[in-house]
C-alpha cells in the first residue's frame, strides 16, 4: 500500500505535507 506524500487523518482523507 503506497502513500502519496501525505498523512492519513481520522476522517479518511489525506493532507499533503
Curated annotation (Swiss-Prot):
It comes from Paracoccus denitrificans. Located at the top of the head of the 30S subunit, it contacts several helices of the 16S rRNA. In the 70S ribosome it contacts the 23S rRNA (bridge B1a) and protein L5 of the 50S subunit (bridge B1b), connecting the 2 subunits; these bridges are implicated in subunit movement. Contacts the tRNAs in the A and P-sites. GO terms for cellular component: ribonucleoprotein complex; ribosome. This is Small ribosomal subunit protein uS13. One of its GO terms (molecular function) is rRNA binding. Belongs to the universal ribosomal protein uS13 family. Part of the 30S ribosomal subunit. Forms a loose heterodimer with protein S19. Forms two bridges to the 50S subunit in the 70S ribosome. Keywords: Ribonucleoprotein, Ribosomal protein, RNA-binding, rRNA-binding, tRNA-binding. Transmembrane segments: none annotated.
Amino acid at each position: 500500500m503506497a502513500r502519496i506524500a501525505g498523512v492519513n487523518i481520522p476522517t479518511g482523507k489525506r493532507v499533503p505535507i
